[in-house]
């Protein structure tokens, strides 16, 4: 697999999702990543630390330049815990848990987050404003309600299926209620 192509596709998708979700500085962005799927394998079976590092470093650079916080979801072997910066955990009141990821428990994305973040910790649960799922890792449990599917400009990064979610405030009220236009639902 061509690493330059994977990096280009990752950058394209992330910038597109950020444009469509209109995330603001200080927002939380969750990443689910299967490096196995990116390489054309089955999720969890052919993990690649190099691919994890390439993708996480690319995304972290884009988000950091905009003041958006990255949370990297692990696999079910770590109960889908997430790696965030300690400052983010403290700012959002997130519960820190004790686990250190490995390639096959947490995954390549989490290992990369531990490498590239300044003071990484694992947290049990977040309510992100939006997120990107590379390889059908199921990020929905970590995106706050109400979730809105976002169609990225590309449907795959490498060989991995790509989806994205944003969130919007709940619409409450009844027949008489009026709702302001939000940044995601343009009409």
Curated annotation (Swiss-Prot):
InterPro entries: Antibiotic_NAT-like (IPR028345), DUF436 (IPR006340). It comes from the Bacteria. Belongs to the UPF0340 family. This is UPF0340 protein SP70585_0722. It comes from Streptococcus pneumoniae (strain 70585).
